[in-house]
Each structure stands twice: as C-alpha cells, then as structure tokens.
Design a protein with these regions (language model features):
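Glycine-rich phosphate/adenosyl-contacting loop at the front of the ribokinase-like
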Residues: 1-69, 73
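Conserved phosphate-binding/catalytic region of the ribokinase-like
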Residues: 1-7, 198-297
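Active-site metal-binding loops of divalent metal-dependent hydrolases
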Residues: 14-15, 129, 157, 257
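Conserved N-terminal subdomain of the carbohydrate kinase-like
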Residues: 43-128
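Hydrophobic anchor at the start of a short beta-strand
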Residues: 44, 70, 151-153, 217
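Structural alpha-helical scaffold elements that stabilize or flank donor/cofactor-binding regions
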Residues: 116-117, 171-172, 210
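Conserved beta-alpha-beta core of the PfkB/ribokinase-like small-molecule kinase fold
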Residues: 123, 128-203, 225-226, 231
Length: 297
C-alpha cells in the first residue's frame, strides 16, 4: 500500500442531520468516522455535498471548529442538506425517516474532487446509503476505482432500507478490500444476494472471500463484541468478546466509533486482531455518553 498524499483517510458519502422534535444532531456514518479520526489526530478528508442552507452553514461551522478539512465539501444551490426526521413514540423509542432528494445524493466527481486524483490515502471509506442516487453512486465508484490497489477500500455496509438493491450491494462488495457489517446486515446480505443455500455464517463468509476477494471481514455483535474473519483462517472467526459497561446511556454511533478506532489503530501499525480489541473498547466507552459524537457541541 502506497501513501502519496497529505492525508491518511478519505471518506465519501452522506452528511445528514438527525432532526428530533426538540433538537438536532449532525451525523451520517462517513462524517462520524472522519470526525472521530480528526479528533484522534489523523489527517482525513470527507467528500460530500451539503445544501446552501442553514444546516449546511451549521455543518461548516462545526467542522471548522473541530479542525475538519472542508476540501472535499461541495455546496448544492438547490438541494437541501441531508435530513433524517426522528419520530419518538410514547415510550421514547425513535423511528428514523431518511428524506429523499438531498444534497448528498448529488456528489460530483471531477473537477470538484480533483484533490483525490493522483493521491492515495491509506484508507478509503464508503457505504451504501449515498449510492441510492445514480449521481453519487457513479462518483463513489469512480473514485474507488482510481484508489483500488493503492488504498485499502473499507466498506461499512450500513444498510438503510429501502435505499439499497442487489446492484449496489454487489458493486460495493466488488470494490472493497475490507468489509464491516453487523449480524442483521449479514443476514440481509445473504437474502439480497440469493445465498440462502448456505446453512451457516462461516460458509457465507467463505463465499464472500472467494466471490469478491475481500481481505478481511469484521462482524460486529453489539454487547458481544465483534468477530474478525481472515481468508487464511477461514472459515473460523477470531472472536473478540467484550463486557460493556453497566453505564450505557446511548448506543447511537457505536458502530462508527468502532470503525474509526479500527482504522486508527491499523494506521498505527497494529495487527487486525489487536486493532479489533481496541476498537471494541472504544465503542463501549462511546456508549457511556449520550450522542454519536460526544464532543459535538
């Protein structure tokens, strides 16, 4: 892997605000990952698109205050900054509605993302949500195509129904070197790809290695930690259980925290096994405070 750029990580995808009845929080998995990495001291870039509106201004203000580069941020003169409407039932359980036709659906490639051309960060991170629209999907896949072989391509599958299909999943798996999914997403991948004939998880993982040539697969399991699958050790996973603190306040953003710490430790030269343990511990600590980004304000 060759690094010939001033930054270590590129994340490309959505910026959204979670809009609650009485408050709002900035988010989107790509932004959350870059936020954490920037606070860890890793030079990072986010490629996304926001609206020319109040939420867009809030995003710029927060990013500047946290030292997050705005080099890859585009502003759309017509489409609004991404929003997720959050509805709470009588018990306070949230229901999320991701609004359609948002600025992040229209991320443009060259010349807007010229800083990517000829540069090879250590890691390039992406997911599936921002690929729901053909404009952003084309930009994401073309960008990853330029980086493939020089940067580690990290797919955090982040399935958000109904915003994915067979083509998006298959193309994304073909592009990635590293896959991260949770248990529910793994079952959904099995269904979407028509792999129901595989009786067990290990056989399914083995199929991903052979079909997509993925180098490492991380399956997160909530309070039970995470498993690391490696092709040379397949089909048996390397298990990393964890004991979460009894002081859990909020699990929102735990997956993004895991990913951020995992990438951070891999950049530091840690083995995937050690990086996984440290990532689990970091995610569990994030769950002890409210919000996906504890120091957002």
């Amino acid at each position: 892997m060759t690094s010939s750029t001033g930054y270590k990580v590129l994340a490309i995808g959505e910026v959204v605000f979670d809009i609650y009845p009485d408050e709002k929080h900035i988010g989107g998995a790509p932004f959350n990952v870059i936020y954490h990495l920037s606070q860890m001291g890793i030079a990072s870039r986010l490629a996304s698109r926001i609206g020319d509106d109040e939420l867009g201004n809030e995003f710029l203000e927060l990013s500047k205050s946290k030292g997050i580069s705005l080099e890859g941020i585009q502003r759309d003169p017509k489409k609004p900054t991404g929003e997720v409407q959050v509805f709470l039932n009588m018990q306070g359980t949230p229901r999320f509605e991701i609004l359609k036709d948002q600025a992040f659906d229209y991320i443009e490639g060259s010349p807007e993302l010229t800083f990517v051309e000829g540069s090879f960060p250590d890691f390039a991170y992406f997911g599936t949500l921002a690929q729901r629209n053909s404009t952003s999907a084309k930009t994401i896949q073309e960008t990853l195509g330029r980086l493939k072989g020089n940067s580690k391509i990290f797919l955090d599958i982040n399935l958000r129904p109904p915003f994915y299909n067979y083509e998006t999943i298959d193309t994304s798996l073909q592009a990635c070197d590293i896959l991260k999914a949770n248990e529910e997403e793994l079952l959904e991948l099995k269904r979407m790809l028509g792999l129901g004939y595989y009786p067990g998880e290990n056989d399914l993982i083995d199929h991903f290695y052979k079909e997509y040539n993925i180098q490492s697969i991380f399956i997160t399991r909530g309070k039970n930690g995470a498993d690391l699958y490696k092709p040379e050790k397949s089909p048996l996973p390397i298990k990393h259980p964890t004991t979460f603190s009894p002081n859990i306040k909020d699990t929102l953003g735990a997956g993004d925290a895991f990913t951020s710490k995992l990438i951070f430790e891999l950049i530091q030269g840690k083995s995937e096994e050690e990086a996984t343990k440290l990532a689990i511990n970091f995610a569990s600590k994030i769950c002890e405070v409210e919000g996906a980004l504890p120091d957002e304000k």
